[in-house]
Amino acid sequence: MQESCDVDVPLLLCAGFLAVNGKCFDPAILSALQKQTSPWQRDVVQPLRVVRQKLKSGSYPVQIDKGEALRQSVKAAELSAEKIQLNMMEDATVQVPPSDIQPNLSNLTAVLAMVVDAQSKTALTPEHMKNIQLIATAILDREAVRA
């Protein structure tokens, strides 16, 4: 979905984290987070992702091991950039109020679908919804293990 829907994965993770921790996540919070972090996502994270993906395609005339070493370095930089974005969102959501909505599969799926739908250039398909529900299930399973 990161590719097919142009999803900002750190934003999706933030939405899921807030929802399962009993915090409000609504269109206003989504919009505020997008406004704050989209320049970082656009100018830092996405260019690193593009370079990593191009290196992965193997279409450059470099030795495979050297190209792979560079790709791994770019991948590490991309992940570091996403962690910085997550920290930005963490700081921005400290004052988010509690939610009355229970963090169950249906509600978490709806929150994640709101994020994906807001970022996608196309309408969400049943396949997208299936993937969103899988992500919601994984988040809830992880939370159950932590409890």
PLM feature spans:
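N-terminal interaction modules that seed assembly of large macromolecular complexes
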Residues: 1-38
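A charged, amphipathic interaction segment
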Residues: 55-138
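Short alpha-helical "patches" and their helix-cap loops
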Residues: 24-40, 101-110, 130, 147
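Long hydrophobic alpha-helical segments typical of transmembrane helices together
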Residues: 139-147
